[in-house]
Amino acid sequence: MEKAKHVTWRLLAAGVCLLTVSSVARADSLDEQRSRYAQIKQAWDNRQMDVVEQMMPGLKDYPLYPYLEYRQITDDLMNQPAVTVTNFVRANPTLPPARTLQSRFVNELARREDWRGLLAFSPEKPGTTEAQCNYYYAKWNTGQSEEAWQGAKELWLTGKSQPNACDKLFSVWRASGKQDPLAYLERIRLAMKAGNTGLVTVLAGQMPADYQTIASAIISLANNPNTVLTFARTTGATDFTRQMAAVAFASVARQDAENARLMIPSLAQAQQLNEDQIQELRDIVAWRLMGNDVTDEQAKWRDDAIMRSQSTSLIERRVRMALGTGDRRGLNTWLARLPMEAKEKDEWRYWQADLLLERGREAEAKEILHQLMQQRGFYPMVAAQRIGEEYELKIDKAPQNVDSALTQGPEMARVRELMYWNLDNTARSEWANLVKSKSKTEQAQLARYAFNNQWWDLSVQATIAGKLWDHLEERFPLAYNDLFKRYTSGKEIPQSYAMAIARQESAWNPKVKSPVGASG
C-alpha cells in the first residue's frame, strides 16, 4: 500500500514538473519569437535581406508572421505571380492589410496590361475606386463592353475627382458613343454641389460641340457664383439649370444673405420656379439669418419663411434660437411647428413638459417627465432632477469570465502582440474587424476582455461597435487614473472633469490625432 502511494506521488510530481517545464518552454518560445521578430524588422530596415530570408522560416508560428509575409510580398509586388498573392489572401482572410492587397494587385496587373490575368485574379469587382476602374477597363479590353459601360457609368456619377486610372475607362466609353451627354450634366451638377470648381471646368470643357453655349455658362457660374442671376436669365429653364442656380445661390447666401434674399423673386421668375423650389431658396437664406445682427425686417422675413418650411432641422434651429434668447412665446410657437416624429425626441419632450409646468398643467408635465426618465441620456437625467426624483442608471454587466474561444484565435493573438509592440493603430484595425464579426453577447465579452487587459480604447471601441450603451464600466473605463491624479493634483480642474474631456475627445486612444495636430 505504501509502495503504491509512493508511486502515485512520484507520478503526480512528475506531472507537475512536466506542466511547469511546458509552461516555461511556451513562455521562452514567445520571448524568443519576439526577439527574432525585432531582429528581422531591424535587418529589413537595414536592407539585410539575406538575414531576413534566413530568419523568417523560424517565425511561422508567431502571430505577427503574416505581417512579415505581407511586407515580403508588397516590397516586390511588381514581380509577384498572381498565385502568390491569391494564396496569401486566402490564408489570411481576416488580416486587415490582406483585405487591401487584392485591390493593390489588381492595379499592379493593370500596370502590366495583363487584362485577362486581372479578371482571372479578381472575378468580382474589387474594393477601391482605382481598382474598379482598372477592372472595368479590363472588361472592355476582353470584349465585355456592356459590363464595362455599366461600371463606367456608376464610377462617373460623382462630384469627386476620380483617380487617373479612370481616365482610360472614361475615354473609351466616350469614344464608343455610349456615353449620354446628359451624364456630363449630371456629373457637373454633382461636382458643383461638392464645390469642386476645377472638375466642373474640366467636364464642361469636354462636352460635345453642340453643348458649348451651356458649357460656357456653366464655367462662368462655377468661377463666379455671384453671376447666378445672369446665368438664370440667359439659359433656358430646365431641371438642370434650376439645380445649378440653386447650388450657386447657396454660395451667394453664405457670403451675403441679404443680397441672396432680395434676389429670390428675380431668380424665381427667370427660372420659372414652383413654390417648393422657391421655398428651398428661402430655407437657404433663413439658415443665414439666425444671428443677433439681423434687422427687424430680416427677422420677420426669416420667421415667415420658416413658418412655411418643411425642413425639420431648420425649425429645430429656430426652436433653439428661442431657447437661447429666453423667448418663451417663440418656444411654444416653434415647438408646435415641429412634425410629430421630431416632437418625440427627448429634447423636445422635455421642453414641452417645461412649458406645461409654466402653465400650471403639472399632471400632464409630470407624466411626460416620468416617461422620459425611463430612457438613457441627458434630458432623461434633467427630467428626474426637475421633479426631484432619483434617476436610476441602467448598467449592464458583461461576463467576468470571457469565453476562451473568443481569445484563442489568430486575430486575438495578433491584437495581443500588436499591443505588446505599442502598434496601437494596427491593433485597433485588427480589433475592429474582430468585434464586427461577433454577436452582441460576444462583443460584450470582448469589451470586458479589453477592459481586463487595460486596453482602454479597445474596450470603448467594442462598446461603440456593438452599441452596448448600457455597459458603462467598459464604455467609460477609469483609464490612466494615477496619471490624471498626478497632473490634476493642486489644480483647479477636478480629476473627473479632466478624464471626461479626455474620454470625449480621444475615446481613450493615446495615438489619436485631431485634424489640427492635437494627439492623445
Spans of features found by a protein language model:
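Residue-level signature for tetratricopeptide repeat
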Residues: 42, 71, 75, 108, ...
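Generic helix N-cap/helix-start motif at coil->alpha-helix transitions
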Residues: 28-36, 47-48, 60-67, 79-80, ...
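Alpha-helical adaptor scaffolds
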Residues: 72-74, 86-90, 102-107, 282-293, ...
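Bacterial N-terminal signal peptides that target proteins for export
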Residues: 2-13
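Alpha-helical repeat scaffolds
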Residues: 51-55, 80-92, 114-124, 146-158, ...
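Catalytic glycan-binding domains that act on GlcNAc-containing polysaccharides
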Residues: 70, 300-302, 307, 359-370, ...
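N-terminal signal peptide c-region/cleavage motif recognized by signal peptidases
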Residues: 20-25
